[in-house]
Amino acid sequence: NRITVCETEEEALEGAQVVTEAIREDLELKVAMFARIEAFIDTQCIVVSNTSSYPMTQMSARMKHPERALNTHWFNPPHIIPLVEVIPGERTAQATVDVVIALLKQAGKLPVPLKKEIPGFLVNRVQMAMLRELLDLRERGVASTEEIDLAIRHSVAIRLAALGPL
């Protein structure tokens, strides 16, 4: 009874307190979707996106109330990885951030708010920096893919999980 099939967007959004956008990665499509969502929701409803491809400031450009929009960046598999990055846009209200953080905590997640938008957000940037270095090491013949995976899995991965990077 937790899933309801609706015939229209208006019906689906009626009474919603939080709406999550997760459509194809296309900025113009997302900008249009945020404006369309806003036409059907209550003035207190929060609108979030899970993308790390675009800043909320751009996606909410056509919204009348961009103060209630932000990014929440979940990680796969979400039932195992507790972290969710919370990234406000330039016009996101602090009250919106606070409500979303409280909801995420209530859902058993570990929200980490970022202070400002940055391409790729925090975790993706760190992960990609490490990936670039590991691919370079493999390309230069320092170690094979299997050896690199073994070395990282049984050293840095454990240390990072236990102590954090800083």
Language model features with spans:
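Helix N-cap / loop-to-helix initiation motif
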Residues: 1, 93, 143-147
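Rossmann-like NAD(P)-binding element
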Residues: 1-47, 53-55
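Electropositive phosphate-/nucleotide-binding environments in soluble metabolic enzymes
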Residues: 6, 27, 31, 53, ...
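A non-catalytic, amphipathic alpha-helix used as a structural packing/dimerization or gating element
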Residues: 29, 95-106, 147-150, 154
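N-terminal alpha-helical segment
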Residues: 30, 79-80, 130, 162
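Aromatic/hydrophobic pocket-lining residues that form π-stacking "cages" and hydrophobic walls in ligand
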Residues: 37, 100, 134
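Rossmann-fold dinucleotide-binding core
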Residues: 49-125
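Helical "substrate-binding/catalytic lid" subdomain
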Residues: 117-166
